[in-house]
Amino acid sequence: MALNCSTPADVTKALSDNNIQFVDLKFTDLYGQWQHFSLPTDYYDEEDLFKSGLGFDGSSIRGFKSIESSDMMLVCDPTTAFIDPVCQAPTLSVIANVYEPGTYEVFSRDPRNVIRKAEAYMKSTGIADTMFCGPEAEFFIFDKVRYETGRYSGQYELASDEAAWNTGNWGPGHKIGYKGGYFPVAPFDAFQDIRSEMVTLMTAAGLKVERHHHEVATAGQTEIDLRFAPMVQMADWMQIYKYIVKNVAAKHGKTATFMPKPLFEDNGSGMHVHQSLWKDGKPLFAGEEYAGLSKMAVWYIGGILTHINSLLAICAPTTNSYRRLVPGYEAPVVIAYSARNRSAACRIPVSSQSPK
């Protein structure tokens, strides 16, 4: 449940009002994975969580610290508190920022601190006061997964009842062909109810969901779209989103994965992000240039394309990323910007005449 807390005192009150038994602190490692630990409410201390901080071993978190300088601190953001829809025991989750001990300097490799710093810089320039982001994350839901990497061997196998490669097996004949998964109804779309359960929990946690549907690929490719939000809030929402997706899938004995290209000869999963700058409540990217853009929007796109090689280290960080970035599978393989063309690195969608 969303709590709409703004102060530590609001969080303390929410613990009592909702008979919370545990407080769960969540933070993001360098690879984007959520980490956490939980406190019984008997040991909850408002000052510890929101001012002094709680310590942890940074050398055991990927990409953070070496063993000789391992101690780090977590200080929670009260505005992020929500009642965790995944936990069985009544649990309030709150997202934390990572700090250096003693000096309380923000930790430079904490992804949440990075985006907070970027937002603060944007505001300091006076160019814009808000950046809205609207990611469209895609993922697969597999029925079974097995993999092994041995010293002299390696293997993996994916199982999906709806997959095109199962047409030769006895059972229901409702299979989705390669590239045939975009928008079919049940019984071809076997994941309607699981997606709806995911959306229900996301909404309960405070996320704003616009739509959900089966995606293009066979074997349970899925998309759930969030309503756009300011950049830091959206970063938090996406962590909650992935947390709920993976846990709901696991509850049903399935595995959800956001890896870019798990299947050969079918579309991979991406997460393109709608972006817009606003100032004083007005959109700065609407104008009279190509595709209804303003000059600022064109310059903004130019900056992305100029630095696209460096951005790939963040946007396409694994070797599997490049298995997706090939022609013929609706992946952005051209360093260009274009209206409607899904092969362009920057696409201007044509869906409405509204400047918003």
Task: Give residue ranges: language-model regions.
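Glycine-rich, acidic/polar active-site loops that bind/position phosphate-bearing ligands
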Residues: A2-K356
